[in-house]
């Protein structure tokens, strides 16, 4: 199987551009197609994350899940050479992403949008009038936290847009605007919400969550309420403090099996719609990592 991809350039690279791209050798880039020869316009995330648009990270997650991922191998004055990432093959990738997150010898890495700012992830090729926007590759636990905060920030932004007094955006930014990892603090580039439902996919996902809350079968809530009051279970002990007080105030005496069945069907449909995103796009399993060379041995999960 020939995994090599040649990306042809429309103009010769400037010397400083060659140096900047060579610093990224070993990093992952998305490709617009699977062809062995491609043009530079289909390289990176620039086509779904331009300077002129507010970032829709969910759209970028979808793109990363559907595109061809490749490792940058060589940079020359008139072309770039990459190796496609396919299941069953082992790769050596470099931890040269900005901002820097420490990787570990074994575990899982998630390929995700550049959620800490486009400028950190971009190499400008003025010679070819194109920006090469790299994704981030993060340890999966921190990638999960990032996604949680982006989605909840979108929900709060919509709440405040409808009724400014319902939430304090300073408090929202304090809790959702950054992540901490191994003693370091990282600011997220949270998207400003551009008017009613302006970020189609991110808004849709946030609405899925909001609607799903209303679709819980009433029998499920009544069972939880009864168990909390009268019985003990390890799971209940774990989640008891997180069950909202509103559950106790909902009228659950008049149960309808037919209504609950409809709720269950729609809720399961929503869950299936969300499942692909919660896999956090492409994941890499790591077998070894060298802190000296910043190189991980990994394969596509």
From Swiss-Prot:
InterPro entries for the chain: Herpes_capsid_2
Residues of the signal peptide: none
Cross-referenced Pfam families: Herpes_V23 (PF01802)
Disulfide-bonded cysteines: none
Top-rank lineage group of the source organism: Viruses
Localisation per UniProt entry: Virion; Host nucleus
Record GO cellular component, one term: host cell nucleus
Gene Ontology molecular function terms on file: structural molecule activity
Assigned keywords, A-Z: Capsid protein, Host nucleus, Virion
Subunit structure: Interacts with TRX1 and major capisd protein/MCP.
UniProt family annotation: Belongs to the herpesviridae TRX2 protein family.
Known function: Structural component of the T=16 icosahedral capsid. The capsid is composed of pentamers and hexamers of major capsid protein/MCP, which are linked together by heterotrimers called triplexes. These triplexes are formed by a single molecule of triplex protein 1/TRX1 and two copies of triplex protein 2/TRX2. Additionally, TRX1 is required for efficient transport of TRX2 to the nucleus, which is the site of capsid assembly.
HAMAP family: HSV_TRX2
Name of the protein in question: Triplex capsid protein 2
Source organism per UniProt: Epstein-Barr virus (strain B95-8) (HHV-4)
């Amino acid at each position: 199987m020939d995994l090599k991809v040649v990306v042809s350039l429309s103009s010769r690279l400037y010397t400083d551009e060659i140096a900047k791209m060579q610093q990224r050798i070993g990093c992952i880039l998305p490709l617009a197609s699977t062809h062995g020869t491609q043009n530079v316009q289909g390289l990176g995330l620039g086509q779904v994350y331009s300077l002129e648009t507010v970032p829709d990270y969910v759209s970028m997650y979808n793109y990363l899940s559907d595109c061809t991922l490749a490792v940058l191998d060589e940079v020359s004055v008139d072309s770039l050479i990459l190796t496609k990432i396919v299941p069953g093959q082992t790769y050596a990738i470099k931890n040269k992403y900005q901002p820097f997150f420490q990787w570990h010898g074994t575990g899982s890495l998630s390929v995700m949008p550049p959620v800490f700012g486009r400028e950190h992830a971009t190499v400008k090729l003025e010679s070819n009038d194109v920006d090469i926007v790299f994704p981030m590759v993060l340890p999966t636990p921190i990638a999960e936290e990032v996604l949680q905060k982006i989605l909840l920030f979108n929900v709060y932004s919509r709440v405040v847009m409808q009724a400014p007094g319902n939430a304090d955006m300073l408090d929202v930014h304090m809790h959702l605007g950054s992540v901490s990892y191994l003693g370091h603090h990282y600011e997220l580039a949270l998207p400003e919400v551009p008017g009613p439902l302006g970020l189609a996919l991110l808004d849709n996902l946030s609405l899925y969550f909001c609607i799903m809350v209303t679709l819980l079968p009433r029998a499920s809530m009544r069972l939880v309420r009864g168990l909390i009051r009268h019985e003990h279970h390890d799971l209940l002990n774990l989640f008891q403090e997180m069950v909202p007080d509103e559950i106790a105030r909902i009228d659950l005496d008049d149960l309808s099996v037919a209504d609950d069945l409809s709720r269950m069907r729609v809720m399961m449909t929503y869950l299936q719609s969300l499942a692909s995103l919660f896999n956090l796009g492409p994941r890499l399993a790591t077998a070894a990592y060298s802190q000296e060379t910043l190189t991980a041995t990994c394969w596509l999960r």
